[in-house]
């Protein structure tokens, strides 16, 4: 979790990467891209205010968290004015850090519904292969212990926009899943 693995900036690499506990690094974005890094209980997000979507979301998923049965939600949160942009748009609100990975904490679950953790996704992707990949990651966490997951949209200069708030609509997404070993 972002609270257990507090994000720190490595002074020697301050211009090149965000360093998380355990040494995992996420490269900083090019200067032309906007980013505000926000730490939540269950994940950290690099939020792009121009496109109103995440640049990336990173979190740890442990075997204990992957087997949690608690289910709190759904919730609203920051940037809720953007929700109406999704209504009848033909796009799902695709979670980057899925609510299903945050069942271990009511606060983490609530924060997973923040729109800074959401990107427009076509229903076939969100309810299909993306959901399958989220479920597979939970299985891997149960089998292997802890995973570090970094996920997000591929942001290009030609993104189409959604609604009056002009939310960026990514064409493609990525999810990097790494096993954490001591």
Protein language model features and the residues they cover:
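Domain-level detector for secreted/extracellular nuclease and nuclease-toxin modules, and
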Residues: 1-182
């Amino acid at each position: 979790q972002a609270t257990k693995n507090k994000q720190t900036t490595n002074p020697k690499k301050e211009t090149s990467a965000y360093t998380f506990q355990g040494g995992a690094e996420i490269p900083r974005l090019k200067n032309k891209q906007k980013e505000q890094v926000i730490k939540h209980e269950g994940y950290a997000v690099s939020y792009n205010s121009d496109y109103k979507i995440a640049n990336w979301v990173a979190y740890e998923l442990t075997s204990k968290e992957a087997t949690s049965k608690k289910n709190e939600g759904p919730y609203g949160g920051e940037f809720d004015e953007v929700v109406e942009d999704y209504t009848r748009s033909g796009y799902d609100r695709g979670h980057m850090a899925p609510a299903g990975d945050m069942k271990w904490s009511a606060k983490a679950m609530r924060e997973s519904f923040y729109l800074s953790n959401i990107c427009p996704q076509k229903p076939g992707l969100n309810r299909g292969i993306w959901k399958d990949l989220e479920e597979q990651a939970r299985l891997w966490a149960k089998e292997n212990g802890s995973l570090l997951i970094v996920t997000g949209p591929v942001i290009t200069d030609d993104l189409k926009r959604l609604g009056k708030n002009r939310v960026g609509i990514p064409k493609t997404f990525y999810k990097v899943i790494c096993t954490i070993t001591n």
